[in-house]
Amino acid sequence: MEKFSVTVIGAGVYGTAIAVAIAKHGNMVLLWGHNSQHIKILKIDRSNQVDLPGVFFPDSLYVEESLSVAADFSQNILIAVPSHVFRCVLLKLRLNLKNNFRIIIASKGLEPKTGWLLQDVVYDVLGKEVPCAVISGPTFAHELAIGLPAAIELASADIKFRYDIEHLLYSVKNLRVYKTTDVIGVQIAGAVKNVIAIGVGISDGMGFGANARAALITRGLSEMIRLGKSIGAISVDVFVGLAGLGDLVLTCTDDQSRNRRFGMLLGQGMHVDYAQKSIGQLIEGISNTKEVYMLSVKYKVIMPITEQIYKILYENKNVHEAVYSLIRRSYIL
């Protein structure tokens, strides 16, 4: 089987996991992170014991502190950093990139303040001629790293690039790749699912049971579809596929999800600030909620679940009042 090379930008839990998964099958992978002390520990331990205990690096996985070396390693640059630092990382990367590079976005969410899709941030910083792809889907990092079966969605309008990345990912054992050209839909799905997961967590934390959970997931999917179609998603297909429904169900129902656990703490009566501290890791859904809500206002999309979660997080609304507002709202949709 043909071997590939890729540079992974972002040495957190997901970046490390996908680097391990790709390198495990003989592909040449270089992992870069911004925290030099963290990178030194990864080099020494040949593992990320903080985020992925017990998962060790294959011989074909290299760890690097120099962004210049990382950028020069491969034309395929996979970015797996939080959405709020995405632009900053691209700006640093731009100073080191050579010709013919290609960007794979593994980050999920929207850019804070602008609400831009991350692909649009790539085009804004690196130019619209850059080949760009997005990967998304129900893939918890630890399961991906240890090689449990999973499926992922690959989106790109660049057919040649999509073909190359499909074959790179195809080399990963137990990973099934599905293709789409709906780049907008995949990115919107990746942001909205985090918001709904907080809502489902709140419901479960309040002890509302399986019926309420199923209702929130279903109506959350409707909100995802409405927003996606308003912004320019090609069809409903991607939302009922892996990047949409698949990732939504995973994030809403499994306690590996930080967004779900955060919501559960809110539902149990914990204040937003204390719940964040209790989780102890970045919760993408908090910033995603603000950006998704602002997009819903901008495009005049009715998203009642998102609206109530926004009010809980940013307007200090009581969770019980938010639930009552949802139950008693008019039957518009």
Curated annotation (Swiss-Prot):
The active site is at residue 193. Sn-glycerol 3-phosphate binds at residues 108, 137, 139, 193, 247, 257-259. One of its GO terms (cellular component) is cytosol. The lineage of its organism: Bacteria, Pseudomonadati, Pseudomonadota, Gammaproteobacteria, Enterobacterales. Pfam families: NAD_Gly3P_dh_C, NAD_Gly3P_dh_N. Its EC number is 1.1.1.94. NADPH binds at residues 14, 34, 108, 141, 258, 282, 284. It comes from Blochmanniella floridana. It is found in: Cytoplasm. Signal peptide: none annotated. It catalyses: sn-glycerol 3-phosphate + NAD(+) = dihydroxyacetone phosphate + NADH + H(+); sn-glycerol 3-phosphate + NADP(+) = dihydroxyacetone phosphate + NADPH + H(+). Keywords: Cytoplasm, Lipid biosynthesis, Lipid metabolism, NAD, NADP, Nucleotide-binding, Oxidoreductase, Phospholipid biosynthesis, Phospholipid metabolism. Belongs to the NAD-dependent glycerol-3-phosphate dehydrogenase family. GO terms for molecular function: glycerol-3-phosphate dehydrogenase [NAD(P)+] activity; NAD binding. Its main location: cytoplasm. This is Glycerol-3-phosphate dehydrogenase [NAD(P)+].
